[in-house]
């Protein structure tokens, strides 16, 4: 897999530069940009993981929290700069649906084909359930309900206030998990496994890779955003479909692959943490940061989703909680999550 990503980066980065300079067709550029970003995201993930192991569990957890969805954040910032707030909100929706239904579904399904029953930490599952309900059902639904009788300025002020609260609670959740209650709910062999882990790269190499990959992703993301309109017209895609399906998958593809591989190796704690942890990071950190950053762009972005987006996200949260709160999984539960994702994808495609 690493060799494939290396080839994609080695070919994709030059092609991205040449294609943008020579003004290749938008559809070709769109495909090249997407594949290259996916490959670069894998390098960012591996560099972050190496730095996390070297820095220790607490700093490592903070690094993962900061860079875990860096690609999604970068793409969204450039989309905000272009005033594409609909695509940004849709990509946030897509990340939630993709992580809770597609990634968790594939992880449960692929792992379940090899193992009849897989277990993961039930305490983490229940702790994350509460945060999911807060982040999606409370923090995302309330702005929609209250904004009905509000003007644009009031909507933005409400969204900024909610965003600040969400970031503070996310920091508190990290402090709870990494400091005050670290290891309290972990199985006895978790610490031993963690101690045996070796970084793939040295600190210097990982830092250089992370820095270089971030710069290149930023460059390609800016060009990718410029292809959205023409690609949407050419293929008949709506802004919702581009954001919910395309941008969300491109921004998280490398992380998605990692979760599925972990499930196949029966490391379900890691697979579930990637799926649910990434969802919480998107909802409680990336979305609020984008709302706050939007006030510095010509077009601000209140945290107000469309009704289909809200219904889809709430449904995904409730389904994931119902399936994961028992602390075990099987292939049929994975198939159920995947079926829900396909139904929602069809709905967004037809909107």
Curated annotation (Swiss-Prot):
It is a multi-pass membrane protein. Induction: Transcriptionally regulated by the forespore-specific sigma factor, SigG, and the general stress response regulator, SigB. Changing residue 252 to A: Decrease in activity. Keywords: Antiport, Calcium, Calcium transport, Cell membrane, Ion transport, Membrane, Transmembrane, Transmembrane helix, Transport. Changing residue 255 to A: Lack of activity. Changing residue 256 to A: Almost loss of activity. Gene3D superfamilies: NCX, central ion-binding region. Calcium efflux is tightly regulated by intracellular pH. GO terms for cellular component: plasma membrane. GO terms for molecular function: calcium:proton antiporter activity. Changing residue 281 to A: Almost loss of activity. InterPro entries: CaH_exchang, CAX-like, NaCa_Exmemb, NCX_ion-bd_dom_sf. Belongs to the Ca(2+):cation antiporter (CaCA) (TC 2.A.19) family. Cation/proton exchanger (CAX) subfamily. Ca(+)/H(+) antiporter that extrudes calcium in exchange for external protons. Does not transport sodium or potassium. This is Ca(2+)/H(+) antiporter ChaA.
């Amino acid at each position: 897999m690493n060799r494939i990503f290396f080839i994609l980066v080695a070919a994709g980065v030059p092609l991205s530069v040449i294609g943008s300079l020579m003004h290749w067709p938008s559809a070709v550029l769109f495909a090249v940009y997407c594949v290259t970003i996916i490959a670069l995201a894998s390098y960012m993930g591996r560099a972050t993981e190496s730095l996390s192991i070297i820095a220790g569990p607490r700093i490592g957890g903070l690094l993962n929290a900061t860079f875990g969805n860096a690609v999604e954040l970068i793409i969204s910032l450039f989309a905000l700069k272009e005033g594409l707030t609909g695509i940004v909100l849709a990509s946030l929706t897509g990340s939630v649906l993709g992580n809770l239904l597609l990634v968790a579904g594939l992880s449960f399904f692929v792992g379940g084909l090899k193992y009849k029953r897989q277990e993961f930490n039930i305490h983490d599952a229940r702790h994350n359930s509460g945060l999911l309900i807060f982040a999606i059902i409370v923090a995302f639904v309330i702005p929609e309900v209250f904004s009905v009788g509000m003007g644009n300025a009031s909507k933005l002020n409400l969204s900024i206030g909610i965003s600040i609260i969400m970031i503070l609670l996310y920091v508190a959740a990290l402090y709870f998990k990494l400091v005050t209650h670290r290891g309290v709910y972990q199985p006895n062999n978790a610490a031993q496994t963690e101690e045996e882990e070796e970084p793939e790269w040295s600190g210097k190499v990982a830092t250089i890779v992370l820095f270089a990959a971030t710069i290149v992703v930023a460059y390609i993301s800016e060009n990718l955003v410029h292809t959205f309109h023409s690609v949407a017209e050419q293929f008949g895609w709506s802004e919702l479909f581009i954001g919910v399906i395309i941008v969300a998958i491109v921004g998280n593809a490398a992380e998605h692959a990692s979760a599925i591989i972990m499930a196949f190796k029966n490391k379900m704690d890691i697979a579930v943490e990637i799926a649910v942890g990434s969802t919480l990071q998107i909802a409680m950190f990336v979305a609020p940061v984008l709302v706050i950053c939007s006030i510095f762009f010509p077009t601000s972005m209140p945290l107000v989703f469309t009704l289909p987006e809200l219904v889809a996200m709430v449904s995904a949260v409730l389904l994931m909680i119902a399936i994961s709160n028992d602390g075990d999984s099987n292939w049929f539960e994975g198939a159920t999550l995947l079926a829900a994702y396909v139904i929602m994808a069809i709905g967004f495609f037809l909107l």
